[in-house]
Amino acid sequence: MYKRILVAIENSAADQTILAHVTDLARLTGAELLLVHVADGFAARHFDDLKLRESEEMKADRAYLEGLKRNLVAQGLTVEYELAKGDPATELIRMVDARAVDLVAMSTHGHRFVSDVIRGTTADKVRHLVKVPVLLLRKQ
C-alpha cells in the first residue's frame, strides 16, 4: 500500500497528533516514515545564497528531528528525516517527487485570517499540487 510516508513536522504539539496516526499506519503497511521540517526564517530562506552557517534555530530543529527519529526507531519503525530550507509548501511538494513519497501526512491549523486569504495555507497548496494522497489532521 504505502512505502514512504512524508510527515510534515512543525516542531510543535501538533506533531504528536500527526505522529500518533502515521506510526500506526506505518506499522500496518511497513512504510518508512520521512520526517520533514522546513525551516523558513530569514537565515534558512537565504542559506545557500548568503553561504550562511546553520542558525541556532536550525540546529534546534535538527536536534528535534533527530530526537523524534530516535524515539520512532526504538519503536521498531524505519525513519529518515530531512531539514529543508525555504517556503514550506514549495519544499514539501518538491520532496514528494524527489523522495518517491506515496502519502503526505500533515496537520492543519485554524485560520490566520488575512494571511490565509492572501497566500493560502501550506496544507492547501500541498494538497492541490501533489499527485499522491494527503492525510490532513486538525491540530488538537
Residues of each region from the PLM?
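Small/aliphatic-rich secondary-structure junction motif
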Residues: K3-D49
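Conserved beta-strand positions in the Rossmann-like core of class I SAM-dependent methyltransferases
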Residues: L34, E80, L135
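Short secondary-structure boundary segments
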Residues: H37-V38, S107-H109, R138-K139
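Short, hinge-like loop/turn segments at secondary-structure boundaries
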Residues: K51-E54, A98-R99, T122-A123
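A short acidic, glycine-rich active-site loop
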Residues: L52-A63
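Structural beta-alpha unit
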Residues: R70-V104
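Glycine-rich, Arg-bearing micro-motifs that act as flexible, cationic patches
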Residues: M106-H128
